[in-house]
Amino acid sequence: EIMPSLVGSEMCIRDRYKEGKYKTFHLADEVFFQSLKRKPVIINTSRGEVIQTDALLKALNSQMISDAIIDVWEHEPEINRDLLEKTFIGTPHIAGYSADGKANATRMSLDAICKFFQIKGDYEINAPAPVSPIIHAKNHEEAVLQMYNPTEDSNRLKNQPELFETLRGDYPLRREEKAYIIKY
């Protein structure tokens, strides 16, 4: 295990090597949280099993961390409801669910298929235009929240955690910032 001096610093970066087939499994475990010198906000949008749920709950309860923003969950769709209630923001694994993300994923898939079959791809993948492409805001934070307010998704999940898969499967299309014109 390698622990650079950055652990607990402003960056809160930790290198850690684990043996075995699943090298990222529970990288953020009890030892990880105990090693933090500051109280960071933990954000997980990568893979649910990267963070050990019980260790994260313990870190939240003992104030080793300031807060948690979780989009991917250990054991989803059967997520830990205690953890969900304690998160600042908890969403149903939808971080990549923007229309732009789906268009990019489709483009990458088509590129790979064309490369594999050695054919020239002649296609254009565009995300649909936003319903209201012009945003009027006082500042950038307000503009971003008009484009997408994650607390709305969080509230839906916290109100009906048993609908995790439905909330994820029926997720409405949203656009990324580049699709909008912001007027301050």
Question: Locations of the language-model features?
Answer:
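Structural alpha-helical scaffold elements that stabilize or flank donor/cofactor-binding regions
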Residues: S5, F32-S35, D82-L83
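NAD(P)-binding Rossmann-fold cofactor-contacting core
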Residues: S9, Y17, H75
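Single conserved hydrophobic/aromatic residue that forms the stacking wall/gate
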Residues: E1-I13
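Residues that recognize and position ribonucleotide moieties
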Residues: P4, H26, E49
